[in-house]
Amino acid sequence: RYRLTILVRGLSDGFDDEAWVTQIARPYMYELCNELVWPIAIATLSGSTMLIRQTTDHRSPLAVEKRGPGFRVAILGSASGIAYLTWCPKEQRDALLDLLAKSKRTEDQSAANRKKVNDLLLETRKRGYAAWRRPRRVSDELSLSVPILAGERLLASLTIRFSSTAVPEAEAIRRFIPRLRATAQRIGE
């Protein structure tokens, strides 16, 4: 079966984010979800938040909290947002951090500590993936995210969510990160 690549689709009239997510990324996401079972999502920048464009929550029996397209997460309060900030162009990153630092939303306030944020982004780039832990009553939810790049252009973040009691973080990094990277590369080709 043949599929158009991101770069080829970008040449067509009327191409938009929704088209590439549904036509190019979704089959790869489903394949990855079938393999790893945990929910997978693609998020893009939308204003001052990350917008979930596509998820496999409805296909994953392990998705405790179902999130669908249109769900928004904070840039500095999510693995997808941290991955996006890490790999976006410096000018865009600086503008986003300035915007977030002025925000009234609690989840954006950490942007005011630019040194701390820059240290986080440097560590994320060094590791090659973003990580985020969200406390929950029963078990923390961990998220790991990698960038989806078309050449040098950042398109989105590819993220997996899982329970910290079911999969310890070190094991998740070993098992999930290589598969996330491979899938992100296939989507971006």
Residue ranges of predicted features:
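Amphipathic alpha-helical effector-binding/dimerization core
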Residues: R3-L99
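A short, flexible beta-alpha/helix-coil linker loop
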Residues: V8-L11, K102-S103, S163-V167
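Short, basic/aromatic recognition patches
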Residues: A25-L32, L97-S145, E189
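Generic structural signal for secondary-structure transition and capping sites
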Residues: V37, R93, K126-A130, Q185
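Short glycine-aspartate micro-motif
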Residues: A41, S143-S145, S157
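Short clusters of small/polar residues that mark proteolytic maturation junctions
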Residues: T55-D57, P135, T159-I160
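Juxtadomain coupling helices with adjacent low-complexity linkers
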Residues: R127, V138-D140, L155-E189
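Sensor-regulatory modules in signal-transduction proteins
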Residues: I148-G151
